[in-house]
Amino acid sequence: MSIKSDRWIRRMAAEHGMIEPFEAGQIKQAAGRSIVSYGTSSYGYDVRCASEFKLFTDINTTIVDPKAFDPNSFVEVKGDSCIIPPNSFALARTVEYFRIPRSVLTICLGKSTYARCGIIVNVTPLEPEWEGHVTLEFSNTTPLPARIYANEGVAQMLFLESDEVCETSYRDRGGKYQGQVGVTLPKI
């Protein structure tokens, strides 16, 4: 497997709609102010968080069970930012919609700006031929409230291309998160 460069990312976005909307370079300012950067980097793509969040609350539940997840465990928040309570988490989605090629596995890593503040981004790999908005999970590991900004960079996607195409892709398996839009809760 090899990591793919900015040139490849730009070509795949232009010719195959791999990332929509797409920024060919790094965007570091908006409306005359500094922002957490997003767009194409040397060997990855920095994604943005949309302005819709699901903030975890323990008001309605006593146990978190991935096989019987209660949607009432979240409060919906819309806005330019979301404040995550101490030792809690929020779900969001990327602004960008992804279409992953059959020979590619995509890994998501958090941006250092957030990591240095105790905010961890968790996303599982984007498998070959998966498509959709990426659901992002932000964990606030600090004892203080933490802010996440919408429409600014929050994580980086790295594209790894295999030297051999997989026999069965995520689409072939009928993956349960295929084509997801919006913030998607756990499914069984």
Swiss-Prot record:
Record has Hydrolase as a keyword: yes
- Write out the entry's keywords from A to Z: Hydrolase, Nucleotide metabolism, Nucleotide-binding
MF terms from GO for this chain are:
dCTP deaminase activity; nucleotide binding
Enumerate the Gene Ontology biological process terms.
dUMP biosynthetic process; dUTP biosynthetic process; nucleobase-containing small molecule interconversion
- Judged by the first EC level, this protein's enzyme class is hydrolase
> Which residues take part in binding dCTP?
111-116, 135-137, 156, 170, 180
User: Known Pfam families for this protein?
Assistant: DCD (PF22769)
The UniProt entry annotates the active site at: 137 (proton donor/acceptor)
Pathway as given in its UniProt record: Pyrimidine metabolism; dUMP biosynthesis; dUMP from dCTP (dUTP route): step 1/2
The record's EC number reads: 3.5.4.13
Q: Which reaction does it catalyse?
A: dCTP + H2O + H(+) = dUTP + NH4(+)
Key word Nucleotide-binding present? yes
Kindly state the subunit structure of this protein. Answer: Homotrimer.
> What family is this protein classified in?
Belongs to the dCTP deaminase family.
Which purpose does this protein serve, as stated in its record?
Catalyzes the deamination of dCTP to dUTP.
The record's annotation in HAMAP family points to: dCTP_deaminase
**Protein name, as recorded:** dCTP deaminase
Q: From which organism does this entry originate?
A: Thiobacillus denitrificans (strain ATCC 25259 / T1)
